[in-house]
From Swiss-Prot:
InterPro entries on file: IF_conserved, IF_rod_dom, Keratin_I
Source organism phylogeny: Eukaryota, Metazoa, Chordata, Craniata, Vertebrata
Low complexity compositional bias, start-end: 464-482
GO cellular component: intermediate filament
Note: There are two types of cytoskeletal and microfibrillar keratin, I (acidic) and II (neutral to basic) (40-55 and 56-70 kDa, respectively).
Keyword DNA-binding recorded: no
UniProt protein name: Keratin, type 1 cytoskeletal 11
Length: 482
């Protein structure tokens, strides 16, 4: 339902403009000598202010003056409560109640739509700011690329260094294995030489024992020769003594004496030949054995000297190889320590970079989740807005139909009741006067509104102004009501 702007002449040049507005509760706050009226500024210097939210209202504060300018915007056909002593209103039927409920719902919807539009704008601004500040497309990763490239270069350098160290370790291990094989070969050769020396020492002991045995035999043969010579000399002496004792029968036994000397000479010759032969044989055998033993001893001594020299050289080579092996082992240990330190450092760096990447991925995931959540909320709000706009369009069509119907009625006549009472008072919503002493409280009701009891006036009687408005002109009549 809509009211066109009409002038209501009369009190203090007061003019009233009625139209469609928001479904709100209006209060006018007056001071001494002013008026309280909804959406109005009474008198000179009157103010108009409002607070919107939760079905909020507009507050108008009147000042001092004789005139009153009233500008009202009706959206709802709610209850108006007057603050006069005898304030009253008109009540309609079920149609008015339904229209009042529809107006209340429409006011709530409009308020909700405005709130959602503001929230939608705020969300759009926040989304734009987030997309500008934290969007994946606008973020600059060039610094990270440089750092990552440097780290890749370092990692490649460390990999090459590890490969070089591993190659050196393998070469050192191969050299150590080669030296170990050489050392084992020399050790086996030394063992064989020592075994040969031990065998030669056994042979030398055997030859020494044989030499000692031969020397004992030579001594025994010499003693036997001396004993035989002594016996021979004794026998010769005995025979000479016998010959001297039997000198008287020399002539008789001369032939036998010759035979005895001959026999003795032959025996002596035989024994001397045997002794000489045995001596020569023994000397030859001894010389042969001594020469063979000397040759063997010389050979063994030469072999022993060569073995000693070889053992000395082998020992010297083994010592040098052992020193080189120790140095290589120390180098391997140091390289292994360096490799372990490098691996630990690379593992720490890799763990740090992995944590940074995970943190950045988490932030990116949270950002995407927040954007998706806000987009979802935006879509929900947009759907709600569309639903509310559809309902508002429906209510607008209903109201336009009601306005057209009421316009036809108001073409003939439209009546309203203005109640003016002195003093302030009037509680509740609507248009209510509540000024101080000596003021005026005005309540305006239309034919489609229902008035309820409100406050109480602080002073005496008031006046009731009943206005009947037509299209062409407007007039009012005033009557006094006790």
């Amino acid at each position: 339902m809509s009211f066109s702007s009409r002038s209501i002449g009369g009190y203090g040049g007061m003019s009233t403009r009625l139209g469609r507005g928001s479904a709100s509760v209006y209060e006018g706050g007056g001071s001494s000598g002013g008026y309280r009226i909804s959406q109005s500024s009474m008198g000179g210097g009157g103010g108009y202010g409002g607070g919107y939210g939760g079905g909020g209202g507009y507050r108008g504060g009147g000042g001092y003056g004789g005139g009153c300018a009233i500008s009202s915007s009706f959206q709802s056909f709610g209850a108006f409560r007057g603050g006069g002593a005898g304030g009253g209103g008109l009540s309609g039927g079920n149609e008015k109640a339904e229209m009042q409920g529809l107006n209340d719902r429409l006011a709530e919807y409009i308020e909700k739509v405005r709130f959602l539009e503001n929230a939608n704008q705020e969300l759009e601004l926040r989304i734009k700011e987030l997309l500008k500040g934290k969007g994946p497309g606008n973020k600059d990763y060039s610094a990270y690329y440089t750092t990552m490239q440097e780290l890749r270069d370092k990692i490649l350098a460390q990999i090459m260094e590890n490969a070089r160290v591993s190659l050196e370790i393998d070469n050192a291990r191969l050299a150590a294995d080669d030296f170990r094989s050489k050392w084992e070969t020399e050790l086996a050769l030394r063992s064989s030489v020592e075994a040969d020396i031990n065998n030669l020492r056994g042979l030398l002991d055997e030859y020494s024992m044989a030499r000692m045995g031969l020397e004992g035999e030579i001594e025994s043969l010499r003693e036997e020769l001396i004993f035989m010579r002594k016996n021979h000399e004794e026998e010769l002496a005995a025979l000479r003594a016998q010959l001297e004792g039997s000198s008287m029968s020399v002539e008789v036994d001369s032939t036998k004496g010759k035979d005895l000397h001959k026999i003795l000479a032959e025996v002596r010759a035989q024994y001397e030949a045997m002794i000489a032969k045995n001596r020569v044989d023994q000397e030859e055998a001894f010389n042969k054995q001594a020469q063979s033993v000397q040759v063997v001893a010389v050979q063994h001594s030469q072999a022993s000297q060569a073995a000693k020299v070889e053992v000395t050289e082998t020992r010297r080579a083994m010592q040098s190889l052992q020193a080189e092996l120790d140095s290589l082992r120390g180098l391997i240990r140091s390289l292994e320590d360096q490799l372990q330190d490098t691996e630990e450092r690379n593992a720490r760096d890799l763990s740090t970079y992995t944590m940074q990447i995970q943190r950045l991925e988490g932030e990116l995931s949270n950002l995407r989740h927040g954007i998706n959540q806000q987009l979802k909320e935006y879509a929900d709000l947009l759907n709600m807005k569309m639903k509310l706009e559809a309902e508002i369009a429906t209510y607008r069509r209903l109201l336009e139909g009601e306005d057209s119907r009421m316009g036809n009625i108001s073409a003939n006549s439209t009546s309203g009741l203005i109640t003016v009472s002195g003093g302030g008072g009037g509680g509740g919503g609507g248009v209510s006067g509540g000024g101080g002493g000596g003021g005026m409280s005005m309540t305006m009701t239309s034919s489609s509104s229902s008035g309820g009891g409100g406050g109480s006036s602080s002073s005496g009687g008031g006046s009731v102004v009943k206005t009947t408005t037509t299209k062409e002109s407007s007039s009012y009549s005033t009557g006094y009501r006790s």
